[in-house]
């Protein structure tokens, strides 16, 4: 057997022969045999990932929000929505009195009492949701916040945007409207440049990108405007209906303001067929 000088490090047992050159290469350029893991290594890696998920869930316990279930009662849901959208302009006591007085019209005492109890619980859920940042379109600055919200909130809609892309601004204007009336869902946005890990992990190459999570699971991706008619002046209700199909919101709600984007007028004569590519 040929012997190699120890100082040269060329022997088959020497690290320099097999590892040094490949270690400096990007992972995707390494030979397949270097990327292969033994069953034990795979088991250790899986346990490590599970531990990280557990630790993250423990870290976000303080962020956990109350269950915001749909009451499945149209009357109660309507009053709760009214309470959520008007409480900012009317005193809570005046609004509650107005809503409760409408229930007094029912002759069935048992029915009225049942609905009053449901209303009180629904109002409490609305207040809890608002305290947790619902009914706002929040801008977050880092990926950790995005992951925390995704783990701690039952329903989350995330917009990955670029500040200079006009279509991202259009999506922002629609999501801001939707967020104000859908108190059951958290709406957030993050600049794509501030989320490099998530952009790569989620394979985002075109902006705007809207991702919907329910119970920490990705349920829908809306990339560009291809699924929104591929035009800039689509109505808010179109995006709202898409979110409903994904279960990212509970139900459609009436809007008092115009359904058109705030950019509708200036974009009527500036239609574009392409979304913006993010690199």
UniProtKB/Swiss-Prot annotation:
GO cellular component term of the entry, any: cytoplasm
Biased composition (Basic and acidic residues): 56-70, 254-267
Residues recorded with modification Phosphoserine: 272, 275
Superkingdom of this protein's organism: Eukaryota
Domain Thioredoxin: 137-248
Cited Pfam families: Thioredoxin (PF00085)
Principal location: cytoplasm
Keywords of this entry: Chaperone, Cytoplasm, Nucleus, Pheromone response, Phosphoprotein, Signal transduction inhibitor
GO biological process, one term: negative regulation of signal transduction
UniProt entry tagged with the keyword Chaperone: yes
SUPFAM superfamilies: Thioredoxin-like
Region (Disordered): 56-75, 254-279
Subcellular location per the Swiss-Prot or TrEMBL entry: Cytoplasm; Nucleus
Family: Belongs to the phosducin family.
Name recorded for this polypeptide: Thioredoxin domain-containing protein plp1
Organism: Schizosaccharomyces pombe (strain 972 / ATCC 24843) (Fission yeast)
């Amino acid at each position: 057997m040929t012997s190699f000088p120890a100082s040269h490090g060329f022997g088959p047992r020497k690290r320099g022969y097999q590892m040094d050159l490949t270690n400096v290469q990007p992972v995707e350029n390494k030979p397949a045999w270097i990327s292969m893991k033994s069953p034990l290594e795979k088991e250790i890696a899986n346990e490590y990932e599970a531990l990280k998920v557990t630790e993250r869930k423990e870290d976000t316990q303080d962020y956990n929000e109350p269950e915001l279930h749909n009451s499945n009662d149209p009357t109660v849901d309507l009053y709760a929505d009214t309470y959520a959208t008007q409480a900012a302009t009317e005193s809570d006591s005046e609004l509650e009195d107005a809503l409760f007085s409408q229930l007094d019209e029912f002759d069935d005492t048992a029915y009225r009492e049942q609905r009053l109890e449901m209303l009180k619980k629904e109002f409490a859920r609305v207040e809890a949701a608002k305290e947790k940042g619902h009914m706002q379109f929040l801008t977050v600055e880092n990926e950790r916040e995005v992951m925390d919200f995704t783990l701690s909130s039952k329903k989350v809609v995330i917009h990955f945007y670029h500040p200079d892309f006009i279509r991202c601004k259009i999506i922002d204007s629609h999501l801001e409207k939707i967020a104000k009336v859908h108190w059951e869902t958290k709406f957030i946005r993050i600049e794509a440049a501030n989320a490099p890990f998530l952009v790569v992990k989620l394979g985002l190459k075109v902006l705007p990108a809207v991702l919907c999570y329910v119970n920490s699971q990705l349920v829908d991706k809306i990339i560009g405007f291809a699924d929104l008619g591929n035009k800039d002046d689509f109505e808010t209700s179109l995006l709202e209906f898409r979110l409903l199909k994904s279960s990212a919101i509970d139900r459609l709600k009436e809007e008092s303001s115009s359904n058109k984007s705030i950019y509708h007028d200036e974009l009527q004569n500036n239609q574009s067929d392409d979304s913006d590519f993010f690199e």
